[in-house]
Amino acid sequence: MRGGRDVVAPGGRLAPVWDLRRDGFTLIEGLVERRELPAVRAEVERVLAGPLPPGCERPHNTLAPLAWDAPIVERLLASRERRRVLAGALAAQDLRWISGYVSVKDPRSEALEWHQDWWCWDHPVSFSEEPAQVAVLVYLSDTSSRTAALRVKPGTHRGGATDRTVTLAVRAGDAVACDYRLLHGTHPNESDARRDCLILNFAPAWSALPDDIRAHLIRHPALPAHGDDELLPDYEGEPRDLVLNRLAPAT
C-alpha cells in the first residue's frame, strides 16, 4: 500500500498485512465472541457507575482503571483459548498482564490527538526490536471514522517518520494490539452513542525485560500483592520507581 490513509473495513480483510513487530500493531479478529458481549458491556456499566480516581478524564477520553481482580478482567482472561490467541498474536515469549482500563469516547466527542503510550524514553529498551509493552484494545461496538475508530501511523514504534495513517474500522469483539511506542489516536465520535473499549496491557517477554523495567512495572497498582496465576508478573528483586519520560526523541 502506498502513502495516505488506508481504511481497514469491518471484517478485517486487510488484517494479514499488519505485523506487530514490523508495523507496531496487529488486528485480532473476534477475540471476544458476539455471545459474550452483552455480559462484558454490563460489567463495563458497573465499572463506570462507580467513582473514578483523580486523573481518569483527559481531553475527549475517559479511562477507568481495572485491577487484576476486577470481574471484567477475570471474564476476559479466564479462557485458556483466549490466552493462547493473545500469546500467538503478540508472539509472546513470556506473556504477563500489567494493567487494564475501560476507555470511553463519549457521544459527540472530538478526536483523541496523536500520542505514544511509552513512558520511559530515556531507557535503552525503548529502542529494542521487541516491544517492552503492548496494549490490547478490545472494542465493544463496531467502529468507523464516524465512531471513534483507532488511527495509527505504521512504523513509528521504531522512530520512523511517516505521513501514512491507517484507520482501523473494526467489529464489536475485535481487538487491536499496539506497541506502546506506536503513534496512535482516534477519529471523533460523531454519533449519539458512547464508544467503549477495554484496554489490557501486557509485557510479551517479561523475563527478558531489563531488571529495572521489571522492578518498576511490578509496582503497578493494578497488580495484586500476591498471586500465582501464570499471567501475573513475578520479581524477586527490590521494586523501584524509574524516572518517567513520555516524550520520544526527535527523529
Describe these PLM feature segments.
Residues 33-34, 102-105, 119, 143-145, ...:
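Short, solvent-exposed loop/turn segments at secondary-structure junctions
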Residues 27-30, 96-98, 149-152, 177-178:
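A structural signal for short, well-ordered beta-strand segments and their strand-loop junctions
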Residues 2-22, 29-124:
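Non-heme Fe(II)-dependent double-stranded beta-helix
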Residues 108-170, 208-216:
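Catalytic core of non-heme Fe(II) oxygenases with the double-stranded beta-helix
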Residues 99-102, 136-138, 198-202:
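A structural signal for short, well-ordered beta-strand segments
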Residues 2, 157-251:
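Conserved double-stranded beta-helix
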